[in-house]
Amino acid sequence: MNFKYIVAVSFLITSGYAESVKNDEQSLSQRDVLEEESLREIRGIGGALLSVGKSALKGLAKGFAEHFGKRSAEDHEVMKRLEAVIRDLDSLDHPEEASERETRGFNQEEIANLFTKKEKRILGPVLGLVGSALGGLIKKIG
């Protein structure tokens, strides 16, 4: 009788243990499913926020580029003049190359007159452009 009692108790313990393991597995799988769903939701929300942030930054960058990148016709002309002045100044930095290119066949006096005229032609617009650029900056700041 003791043997039957031990077997019956062992059977009850194993079946109880098996059922608790089964319940644990189910609760773990349910918990895993819930965690996975919540992670998907969080990822979805995070992805949406990230895409909104990216588009906002792109829009902001585009707005800044449009605002600060716009040039009026007057600004465009000023920039063209500045580029021409810079080219002329570059030719003054290398007078040998400029004189070879521009003044072939002139005598020394004509070359001296040409450089004097070129210096006058450069300094006038440069001072005017610098003054107008500073004036424009002061107006925009003020």
Swiss-Prot record:
Positions carrying Isoleucine amide: I141
Propeptide: 19-43, 72-121
Signal peptide segment: 1-18
Broad class of the protein's primary localization: secreted
Subcellular location: Secreted
Positions bearing Phenylalanine amide: F68
Any one of the GO CC terms: extracellular region
Tissue/organ expression: Expressed by the skin glands.
UniProt KW keywords: Amidation, Amphibian defense peptide, Antibiotic, Antimicrobial, Cleavage on pair of basic residues, Cytolysis, Fungicide, Hemolysis, Secreted, Signal
One Gene Ontology biological process: defense response to bacterium
UniProt family annotation: Belongs to the bombinin family.
Protein name per the record: Maximins y/H11
Protein's organism: Bombina maxima
